[in-house]
């Protein structure tokens, strides 16, 4: 069995030797037994706290196997809207419910849920149930790569904003 232990950002001269197609629930896991798309057995033994993204490369300890992760199409609800204010309202209401959310210009996507679909329709949005890869924002599962940390040597002063009239 191939044991994938490393994320590879620059494969150099290594050639991709296989792919694995995973839904978002599997891409959240750091320990997982899986079957590559060509039928070979493999295991994930990765650091915790990182959502695998479609296109990421994984390797075994000695670099013999380089595997590309593919995001599997899955049941999602997709909202497309040209009105940024309406889209922001939808994102607010979904975020208030802690829904993992994929955000792109003019588009919101989340794992299909008919109750959430109805809520968004009530806001005046059109919601499509479809099969598509789901790539939620990093904040739902992990801190974003190269994100801002507050573990540094200075304070952020509190600023009181004036009350709205």
Curated annotation (Swiss-Prot):
GO terms under cellular component: cytoplasm
Location(s), subcellular: Cytoplasm
Keyword Magnesium: no
GO molecular function: nickel cation binding; unfolded protein binding
Keywords carried by this UniProt record: Chaperone, Cytoplasm, Nickel, Nickel insertion
Family annotation (Gene3D superfamilies): Urease metallochaperone UreE, N-terminal domain, UreE, C-terminal domain
Keyword Coiled coil among UniProt keywords: no
GO biological process, one term: protein folding
SMART domains named among the record's database cross-references: UreE_N (SM00988)
SUPFAM superfamilies, per database record: Urease metallochaperone UreE, C-terminal domain, Urease metallochaperone UreE, N-terminal domain
Primary location class: cytoplasm
Superkingdom in the source lineage: Bacteria
Coiled-coil stretches: none
Region named Disordered: 137-156
Family classification: Belongs to the UreE family.
Biological function: Involved in urease metallocenter assembly. Binds nickel. Probably functions as a nickel donor during metallocenter assembly.
Protein name: Urease accessory protein UreE
Originating organism: Pseudomonas putida (strain GB-1)
Lineage of producing organism: Bacteria, Pseudomonadati, Pseudomonadota, Gammaproteobacteria, Pseudomonadales
């Amino acid at each position: 069995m191939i044991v994938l232990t490393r994320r590879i950002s620059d494969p150099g001269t290594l050639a991709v030797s296989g792919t694995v197609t995973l839904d978002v629930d599997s891409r959240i896991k750091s320990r997982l037994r899986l079957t590559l798309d060509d039928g070979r057995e493999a295991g994930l033994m990765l650091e915790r706290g990182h959502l695998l993204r479609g296109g990421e490369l994984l390797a075994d300890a000695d670099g013999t196997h380089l595997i590309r992760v593919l995001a599997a199409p899955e049941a999602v609800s997709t909202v497309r809207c040209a009105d940024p204010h309406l889209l922001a309202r939808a994102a607010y209401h979904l975020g208030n419910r802690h829904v993992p959310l994929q955000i792109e210009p003019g588009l919101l996507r989340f794992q299909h849920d008919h109750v959430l679909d109805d809520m968004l329709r009530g806001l005046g949005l059109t919601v499509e149930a479809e099969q598509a890869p789901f790539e939620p924002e990093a904040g739902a599962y992990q801190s974003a790569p190269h994100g801002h940390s507050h573990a540094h040597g200075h304070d952020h002063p509190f600023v009181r904003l004036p009350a709205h009239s």
